[in-house]
Amino acid sequence: MAKIQFSRGLDEEVIPEVRLTRSRTGDTGTATFIFTNPKILDQGTTEDITGMYLIDEEGEIITREVKGKFVNGRPEGVEAVYVMKSAQEWERFIRFMERYAQENDLGFSKS
């Protein structure tokens, strides 16, 4: 049931690239989601992007830091940043990502 939405009720089908950073103390972190040609930018979609909603059985994680990427005046992608300000937020985010990865056959690699 783990899913990502940019507009409530409209599930995003494009799987993002996710980049994680974490402080040395483990208290804070940042997740950057990069979507290439997401469904929300399709010509037929009239919904506004109101944020990025990470939804699973525990509830939802919300970020409003969402930006569109344009090439030659055409929408090409969406980049969203979620900032985790505590170890609890980090752990909650990781639980969501584990569910999302399992449902979408994704892997994790350290760089």
Swiss-Prot record:
PANTHER family: PHOTOSYSTEM II REACTION CENTER PSB28 PROTEIN, CHLOROPLASTIC (PTHR34963:SF2), PTHR34963. Part of the photosystem II complex. The lineage of its organism: Bacteria, Bacillati, Cyanobacteriota, Cyanophyceae, Nostocales. The keyword Thylakoid applies. One of its GO terms (cellular component) is plasma membrane-derived thylakoid membrane. It is found in: Cellular thylakoid membrane. The keyword Signal does not apply. This is Photosystem II reaction center Psb28 protein. It comes from the Bacteria. It is a peripheral membrane protein. Its main location: membrane. It holds the Pfam family Psb28. Keywords: Membrane, Photosynthesis, Photosystem II, Thylakoid. GO terms for biological process: photosynthesis. Belongs to the Psb28 family.
